[in-house]
Amino acid sequence: MAIAESFKVEDGFSVLAGVVARRDGTVEAVAVDTATVGGTDATEAAVRIAERLLKPDVSIIMLDGCVVSFYNWIDGEALWRRFGVPVACYVFEDPEGRVEEAVKKLFKDWELRIEAIRRLGWPTPYYTKSGYKIYIRSWGIDPADAGRAAELCAKFGKWPEPIRVAQLVASGVREYLSRRSR
């Protein structure tokens, strides 16, 4: 299972999409939810998606990033503890490390946000057999095993297919909702 999001600051909301897919990439189920851009509710949106999609044969929850929707966040440990399914958060570009500076400038509740983001931990680099470098935070699974899980279902480049499809769904739904609200 994978969860990805799409947002534009001016919309005020982000769309999170969850996809259940088999290892071969065949999509079995999709669910969507929303979170607030710059809010603190992305974990709750991810929980609602997981409640709708999780089945006994889902072996991992893959997150396309943990800091989402303009410094909102998904707490991978909370998902793991709630559902008992390993959670891996993937970052496909080098983490910049300037998150704390930006959060302090942008938010009155910056201390809460920085504490939550620090609790996520620093991602571990993982090198795929194809030579890609991805960064992984994980709960209930070793980062190297989470990296191998991502490789097993990657069809194009470094992105696991369930994450790629979840990104497409989230983007399409966000575009639709954004156009409707104009």
Curated annotation (Swiss-Prot):
This is UPF0215 protein Pcal_0119. It comes from Pyrobaculum calidifontis (strain DSM 21063 / JCM 11548 / VA1). InterPro entries: Endo_dU (IPR002802). Belongs to the UPF0215 family. HAMAP family: UPF0215. It comes from the Archaea. Coiled coil: none annotated. Pfam families: DUF99 (PF01949). Signal peptide: none annotated.
